């Protein structure tokens, strides 16, 4: 009898403890702040070489215009609207967990980052933490930018400081409650020195370039809202927008469904396919040719970088995955 009474008391306590534990856990998840570190006190020196490197990163490799500049997606490749570089605005991807806005990153002191220190800008780029300490939604690819070398992130900041200031108030993103809690673990402060990668490192240098450019992020399909790591670079991630729906391509070395049969010349020509449209004369397109792939930016990748990226992609695991880029529309061959 005593054993039975003790067992009943034990299970009763357990039943009381479980909801208390769940409530405490939920409260912790709600009130906890994302990991962050104080911004560095660095002051980036403005040199012509650094600004030029930053321009290459901003406009080409990292394609910052893709989110932070107004673009015309009724035209092939979504060319940037003149005079709109860095002004920010609402992201037009469907299926996002709320209203997501890309901030104004011009030097405007009231609506942009003109009053931010260089250290605060670097922290936002690599750590995903804004000037006031709030977390940036990780549609901003700072999980990849945390690998930017110190000299590259300083170059990026230097170029941003040269942009014309645009007065354009952009509201803060409004994310669903559950998702806002789940993504709090994404920011990881960069607290170490990150040296430059040897530009003559072949596929190792290519891995650095592909990582900060976010190739894997777009070219890996998702499963239940998370990247399917078993299908890295295999394409098939769905991007739905007001202008059309497009699926990312398979860029693994699979010979039938990826780029396994491509040589470097074909890869280079594909990346530079927008060069034929001079003076921003990009044709009007419908959903059958809509693309989010930043060909307009990548046409300016230098041969050395492009070849390194190609070597890296060719070294990945080949995955058979046939992708129809524009569902419901006939495929347009290269």
Where do the PLM segments sit?
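N-terminal type II signal-anchor transmembrane helix
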Residues: 2-38
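Electrostatic cytochrome c docking/interface patches
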Residues: 36-59, 183-211, 257-259
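The canonical Cys-X-X-Cys-His
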Residues: 54, 61-71, 121, 156, ...
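Extracytoplasmic/periplasmic/luminal assembly and interaction segments
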Residues: 57-99
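Detector for the c-type heme attachment site
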Residues: 67-73, 126, 141, 161-162, ...
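Electron-transfer interface patches adjacent to heme c in soluble/periplasmic c-type cytochromes
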Residues: 85-120, 143-153, 232-278, 295-306
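A cross-kingdom feature marking solvent-exposed beta-strand/loop segments within repeated
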Residues: 132-148, 277-300, 321-322
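Extended surface/linker regions that mediate inter-domain or inter-protein docking
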Residues: 141-143, 147-205, 305-312
């Amino acid at each position: 009898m005593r054993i039975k009474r003790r067992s009943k008391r034990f299970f009763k306590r357990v039943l009381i403890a479980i909801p208390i534990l769940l409530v405490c856990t939920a409260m912790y998840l709600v009130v906890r702040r994302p990991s962050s570190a104080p911004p560095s006190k660095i002051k980036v020196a403005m040199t012509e070489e650094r600004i030029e490197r930053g321009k290459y990163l901003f406009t080409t490799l990292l394609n910052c215009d893709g989110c932070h500049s107004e673009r015309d997606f009724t035209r092939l490749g979504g060319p940037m609207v003149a005079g709109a570089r860095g002004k920010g605005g609402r992201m037009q991807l469907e299926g996002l967990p709320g209203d997501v806005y890309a901030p104004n990153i011009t030097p405007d002191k009231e609506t942009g980052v003109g009053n931010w220190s260089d250290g605060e800008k670097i922290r936002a780029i690599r750590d995903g933490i804004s000037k006031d300490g709030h977390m940036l939604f990780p549609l901003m690819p700072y999980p990849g930018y945390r690998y930017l070398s110190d000299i590259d992130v300083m170059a990026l900041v230097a170029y941003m400081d040269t942009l014309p200031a645009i007065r354009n108030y952009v509201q803060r993103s409004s994310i669903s409650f559950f998702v806002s809690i789940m993504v709090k673990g994404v920011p990881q402060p960069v607290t170490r020195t990150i040296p430059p990668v040897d530009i003559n490192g072949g596929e190792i240098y290519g891995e650095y370039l592909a990582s900060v450019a976010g190739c894997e992020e777009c070219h890996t399909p998702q499963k239940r809202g998370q990247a399917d790591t078993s299908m890295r670079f295999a394409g098939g991630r769905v991007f739905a927008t007001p202008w059309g729906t497009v699926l990312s391509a398979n860029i693994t070395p699979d010979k039938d469904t990826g780029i396994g049969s491509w040589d470097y010349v074909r890869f280079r020509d594909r990346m530079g396919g927008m060069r034929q449209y001079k003076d921003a004369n990009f044709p009007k397109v419908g959903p059958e040719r809509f693309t989010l792939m930043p060909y307009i930016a990548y046409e300016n990748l230098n041969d050395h970088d492009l070849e390194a990226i190609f070597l890296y992609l060719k070294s990945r695991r080949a995955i058979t995955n046939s992708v129809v880029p524009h569902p419901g529309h006939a495929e347009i061959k290269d």
